[in-house]
Amino acid sequence: MINVLINKSSKLVNGVDSCINNKTIRLFCSSSSTNQVNKTPFNLCIIGSGPAGLYTAAKVHRQIPHANITILEKLPYPFGLVRSGISPDHQNEKKVKNTLEKVLLEHPHQIQFIGNVDIEKDIKFQYIKDNFHAVVLACGIEGDKKLGIPGELTLKNVYFAREFIGWLNGNLKDQHKQFDLSNENLAIVGQGNVALDVARLLLKKNSDELKKTDITSTSFDKINKSNVKNIHIIGRRGPLEVSFTNKEIREILTLQNVNTFINDISTLDVSEEDVSKLERAKKRTFELFKQHLKPFDQEIANNGNMNLIFHFLRSPVELLDKYGSSSGSGDGMVLSKIKLEKNKLIIDEKTQQKKAIGSGEFEIIECSSLFRSIGYTGTKQFPSVPFDFNSVSIPNKYGKVLEEPNSDKFINGLYVSGWLKGGPSGSIPNISANSEETASIIHQDYESNQFINNNNNNDGGHNSITSLLQPNHKIINFNDYKKIESEEVKRGKEKGKLLEKIIVFDELKNIINNS
């Protein structure tokens, strides 16, 4: 019997049975009471090969060993954000790739990877549903949040932080991006770890440590040649409300040859009562700010080091060119300055939580490139699948998709895992637990035959994918990926680094065909 922890002890709905004991849902009550083994054919398609998809595959395989699981991936390689979203200088975090890879290595007949398949573009989602008993959506969240201010869409050199990290990591879909690092002043809007990733990597200019990672040589060379000297991290909230984790904030505040400043020292003046209400980790974050952030000093800033300047309680309200315009007309199409509004925190009457509102006071800082890292809006990726833009997730109960938000009616055979299930946040361990819950619901539905296709035969499934694609479409299986990886490791050794990622798709195809 498998126990899955959840936040509340309400019963599953619409025929999904369970036994409930306080905060623990004990699933499979009926199936655990019999010694009979269900051998009904089961073809499962998982869309997305990141941690959510692979963890779900492993946990379903453990519970339904004879299941045929096909994992579809838009990119030509697996592992999702582990390969393309974790900062190159955080190799310890990337080691989870070894665990994920075992899912594909140890069960090659039951769990099969097919890369370079873009749903709707290469194959219709409806065809997937027609050829599998069940489908799990585990491909993450698309759609970065915009600032929604004048100049954001009209001036050049305004980017998303996530694209920059993908570019550094050799993610194919980000290689066409051009990032201007030719000027001294750069700003990052956001108070989460991705904002720190961008700043930290730029501050590690000429770092041998960074050079030896899996960062692409192209992007490493560009960072080394950059003229960036002053990096501004801007956030609408105060130092007590940031989303930085202690490990990341400590790392960036203790970098060698970096001056760490705060633009407005008064923003660190917070009441002892407010500090006392913080969780332990948040208290430590605030202590780190007080310990390392000094009032901006121009003389120190000119000492040859790079400068990191934190701006708390500030919101960008307009992006300006060198003429002070946000229209982007004529030769003034390039970002030059940011207009910021000073904020103050008030208690929201509805939520009783602090929120930042503008004070009507403004200031302007020099800035020639801007990275946005303020969250995700989400996009509706699949026809006929509902999407809740408020929670930035697909509405579901314990991983089974609902017909609409707050509904009590399920869509049989359709499941969700990872960020699409719970919203765009959560560590790898959280995603593992998230996937466990989804796998449990799939197992229970398998026992009761509540799927898209209830036919008890083994038609369709993995073997149907190639027939549904165009004849000349290049699919990439796991053996193909291992050829790519082998070549990347070889090229990396030649350069004295972990690996050298291949960033041109045609080159990937040639490696596969000629190996």
Swiss-Prot record:
SUPFAM superfamilies: Nucleotide-binding domain. Its cofactor is FAD. One of its GO terms (biological process) is electron transport chain. GO terms for molecular function: ferredoxin-NADP+ reductase activity; oxidoreductase activity. InterPro entries: FAD/NAD-bd_sf, FAD/NAD-binding_dom, Ferredox_Rdtase, Ferredox_Rdtase_adrenod. Pfam families: Pyr_redox_2. The keyword Metal-binding does not apply. GO terms for cellular component: mitochondrial inner membrane; mitochondrion. Keywords: Electron transport, FAD, Flavoprotein, Membrane, Mitochondrion, Mitochondrion inner membrane, NADP, Oxidoreductase, Transit peptide, Transport. Transmembrane segments: none annotated. NADP(+) binds at residues 191-194, 236-237, 248, 426. It catalyses: 2 reduced [adrenodoxin] + NADP(+) + H(+) = 2 oxidized [adrenodoxin] + NADPH. The keyword Electron transport applies. Its EC number is 1.18.1.6. FAD binds at residues 52, 73, 81, 119, 419, 426-428. It is an enzyme of class 1 (oxidoreductase). It is found in: Mitochondrion inner membrane. It is a peripheral membrane protein. Coiled coil: none annotated. Belongs to the ferredoxin--NADP reductase type 1 family. This is Probable NADPH:adrenodoxin oxidoreductase, mitochondrial. It comes from Dictyostelium discoideum. The gene is fdxr.
